[in-house]
């Protein structure tokens, strides 16, 4: 694993740069990301490039023995560009412009802005594409951050109409697919179709789903335009994009296919605070992050670009954007670094080198404080670098378990949750965590992935079944678990003929006759687990493998395939993992609370995420908080 940092030479006096570079090398860093927000300094006036400062910055880093990850600056179009084409900004769902004054103030569909992006990316690639310091390109920065995937601008509306025309061919085909006979929503031409916002009550869910598909395609094509330029002008240099955590607004598999390395921005403490975790979990893991947050995203993004992945921004201290922003427990920055290595990362880059004393992120910690003194994370980086040097490169081992993740499933359940607490990401994360708690390594894969090498397959939910998926499931010999709502919609957001699970009945013969959602706090009893949030009534000649206290079926099994007809709580997930692992011949480990295990091809890594010391039976020793054990396999 190569270690690096995010650096902004334009923020600091030029006479600091050489000393910064020297200190980076001394800390064990070898990569430096620069440039991703610097458009106004690269092109201060329209058509007038100021390359001098960037030339000198790159050369300074190069002389110090550092390699550069150069970002395209398209996440921050300068004021002069916004003033020249004010219609380039995104419009939010309420019809308000997403204006200048922060970042990501553009619409993916605006052709004029895309032209400007191609121009600036071409200029960068022509100047630096063959520079010996250049290790990697990063396209833009955090696509979709600040809720910017969806835009309801005129540019988006026009592009959406073209997208619909290409997809459906005729307005009547669109009307039929969407069911627009309902509420007299029929269109006579594609020109009549608007984005699905500013309606009196909810818009047609099929309209929403196509708008999300369209918006995702726009992100992918926007990225592809930059990738095509970089490949043409800088063909020997890898390309990445830095994705985010717990973010599903566009299909990351689609973008991942176009880059060489999928990277993501890891902020375990911020994510714990911002998402669904319970008060008890937020208290127990306040300074460590939930033990599966980082690992979940490592495994997700490893699957998004065919195996090559890394961390582009690693939290080094308190962040500035969560509801509360605690400091990491001493040792956690090193632990997060080594855990990324255990999951096969090619790089871990810390955000940022020096904490900014100004502007929006001045409360976000860095490896250095604003006065250039070392912050608490700096010695941990040196310690992690030493460990990485000792253990050497880590190849990723084939995981025994595949967990199927579909961005479209997140859109479907988000558009029509049918229950306030039905959250796709939480359902998937709970399944992942249940596997990890028993010491199992997991690959997170797209529905289109080849599943034949796995010994267990878990599909937390897959409302729309893609072509070929049933054949791949049926051809497996390993245990398969299908979660609630699987097969519940067609591609045009209809209830399938013959009811759910639609075409999945070819794999498991049952019919979902009714669904209901339960408010928080309502439970229905069962032996060893509880029915909460969501349940389905099932008609089948199969006898339930698992039932609730009233005898209502919860889990059905047909051969190697199971269907779970409720939101599975942790106790039920544990039961199912145990049964399926037994059938698959997989050894389980009952890991103590806060302990996680990950195996590379050559080493076994054990990490303690608990806030105190924990005795670890499989090691026969006690691990201190925020510590690890690494042993050859």
Regions found by a protein language model. Name each.
Residues 5, 24, 32, 61, ...:
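Conserved, mostly hydrophobic/aromatic
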Residues 94, 98-300:
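Polysaccharide-binding and catalytic clefts of secreted carbohydrate-active enzymes
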Residues 2-14, 35-54, 99-118, 140-149, ...:
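The substrate-binding groove and active-site-proximal loops of carbohydrate-active enzymes
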Residues 205, 240-430, 510-529, 533-534, ...:
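Hydrophobic targeting/anchoring helices
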Residues 11-26, 117-123, 244-254, 329-338:
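Short, acidic/polar
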């Amino acid at each position: 694993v190569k270690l690096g940092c995010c650096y902004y030479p334009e923020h600091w006096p030029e006479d600091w740069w050489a000393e910064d570079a020297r200190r980076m090398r001394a800390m064990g860093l070898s990569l430096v990301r620069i440039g991703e927000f610097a458009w106004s300094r690269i092109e201060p006036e329209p058509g007038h490039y100021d390359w001098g400062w960037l030339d000198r910055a790159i050369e300074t880093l190069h002389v110090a023995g550092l390699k550069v990850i150069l970002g395209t600056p398209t996440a921050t179009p300068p004021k002069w560009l916004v003033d020249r084409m004010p219609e380039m900004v995104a419009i939010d769902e309420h019809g308000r412009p997403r204006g200048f004054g922060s970042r990501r103030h553009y619409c993916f569909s605006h052709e004029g802005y895309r032209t400007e992006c191609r121009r600036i990316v071409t200029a960068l690639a022509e100047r630096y594409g063959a520079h010996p310091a250049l290790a990697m390109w990063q396209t833009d920065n955090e696509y979709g951050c600040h809720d910017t995937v969806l835009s309801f601008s005129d540019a988006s509306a026009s592009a959406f109409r073209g997208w619909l025309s290409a997809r459906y061919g005729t307005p009547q085909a669109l009307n039929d697919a969407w069911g627009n006979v309902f509420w007299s929503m029929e269109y006579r031409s594609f020109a009549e179709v608007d984005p699905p916002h500013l309606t009196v009550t909810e818009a047609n869910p099929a309209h929403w789903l196509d708008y999300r598909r369209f918006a995702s395609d726009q992100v992918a094509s926007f990225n592809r335009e930059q990738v095509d330029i970089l490949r043409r002008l800088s063909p020997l240099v890898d390309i990445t994009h830095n994705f985010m955590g717990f973010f599903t607004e566009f299909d990351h598999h689609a973008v991942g296919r176009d880059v060489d390395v999928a990277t993501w921005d890891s902020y375990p403490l911020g994510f714990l605070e911002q998402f669904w975790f319970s008060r008890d979990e937020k208290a127990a893991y306040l300074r460590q992050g939930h033990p599966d947050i980082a690992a979940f995203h490592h495994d997700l993004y490893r699957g998004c670009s065919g195996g090559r992945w890394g961390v582009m921004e690693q939290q080094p201290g308190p962040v500035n954007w969560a509801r509360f922003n605690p400091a990491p427990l001493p040792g956690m920055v090193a632990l997060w670094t080594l855990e990324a290595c255990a999951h096969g990362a090619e790089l871990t880059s810390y955000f940022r080198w020096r904490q900014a004393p100004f502007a929006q992120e001045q409360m976000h910690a860095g490896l250095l404080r604003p006065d250039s003194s070392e912050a608490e994370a700096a010695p941990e980086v040196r310690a992690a670098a030493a460990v990485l040097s000792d253990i050497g490169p880590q190849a990723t081992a084939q995981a025994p378990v595949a967990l199927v993740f579909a961005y479209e499933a997140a859109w479907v359940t988000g558009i029509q949750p049918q229950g306030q607490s039905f959250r796709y990401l939480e359902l998937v994360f709970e399944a992942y965590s249940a596997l990890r708690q028993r010491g199992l390594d997991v690959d997170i894969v797209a529905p289109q992935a080849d599943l034949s090498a796995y010994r267990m397959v878990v599909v937390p939910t897959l409302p729309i079944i893609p072509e070929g998926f049933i054949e791949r499931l049926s051809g497996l010999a390993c245990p398969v678990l299908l979660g609630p709502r699987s097969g519940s919609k067609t591609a045009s957001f209809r209830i399938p003929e013959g009811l759910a699970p639609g075409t999945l009945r070819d794999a498991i013969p049952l019919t979902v006759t009714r669904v209901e959602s339960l408010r928080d706090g309502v439970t229905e009893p069962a032996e060893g687990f509880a029915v909460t949030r969501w349940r389905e009534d099932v008609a089948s000649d199969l006898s339930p493998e698992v039932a609730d206290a009233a005898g209502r079926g919860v889990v059905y099994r047909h051969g190697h395939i199971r269907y779970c007809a409720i939101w599975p709580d942790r106790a039920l997930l544990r039961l199912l993992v145990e049964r399926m692992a037994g059938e698959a011949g997989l050894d389980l480990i009952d890991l103590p609370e806060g302990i996680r295990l990950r195996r590379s091809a050559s080493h076994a890594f054990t990490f303690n995420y608990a806030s105190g010391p924990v005795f670890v039976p499989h090691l026969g020793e006690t691990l201190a908080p925020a510590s690890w054990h690494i042993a050859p396999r």
